[in-house]
C-alpha cells in the first residue's frame, strides 16, 4: 500500500520542530562559546608559557622578524622546531607593527580559530543545514577546546594550519573548477604551516576524481601538490638541506605514541 504523502499541516509542524531544535542547539552553542571565549580572552595577555612550546615558538618568530635562520644546527640559544615556518613568518611580520610577545602570538591563533569556525559554518550550510543549525556547530567546535589541548589560542602553528585546512576541505568539493584550485592552493599553504596536513591530500584527490572526473583531479594536483613541492625545494635549497632534516628526519627518529 503506497504511503500517504504528508499534508501541508504536517510539513509545517515538522518545519517548526526542526527550527525549534536548531534554535535550542544554537542557544546551547552560544553558552559554550561564551564560556570558552571568556577563558581564551583571560589567557591572551598571560605573561608566561601556558604550554611548553609557546616561548620557543616566539623565539622562532623573533628570528623571522630579525631575518635570522629558522633551520640549522642546534645551538645553545636556539633549536629549530620540526614544523614549517608559516606561523613564525606571520607573527614575525606582525611584530614589525605590534610588540612581539604572548599576546600577539595568541591573538594570531585565536583569529585563525575564528576563521576555522567560519569554514565549519560554511560547510554545514553547503550540506543544507539551516542557519541556526549551521551556527550551532561552532558550539561543538568550541566544546573540543579542552580535549584538543586548548591549542585554539596558543602560540603554536596548530590553529593556523587548522584554519587553512578547514577552508581547503570545504571549498574543494564545490562544483566550480575555481573552487578546486582554491582548495588545492589552501591545502598547499596549510602544508607550509604544518606538514601533517599532507595526509589529507590523498583522500581529497580520490574524492575529486570520483566526483568531478580525472581532469578535475589533475587540476587539484597542480594546485596543491606542485606548489607544496616547490615550497619544499626552495626551502631545502635556501637552508642547505637543514629544512628537510628538521621537517622529516628528526620527527622520523621520534618514538610514536599511538594513544595520542
Model regions and ranges:
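Loop-to-helix entry region of an early transmembrane alpha helix in multi-pass inner-membrane enzymes
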Residues: 85, 89, 97-118
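Specific aromatic-rich, kink-prone transmembrane helix
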Residues: 160-179, 183-187
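Multi-pass, polyprenyl lipid-linked donor-dependent membrane glycosyltransferases
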Residues: 107-112, 136-143, 147-167, 193-200
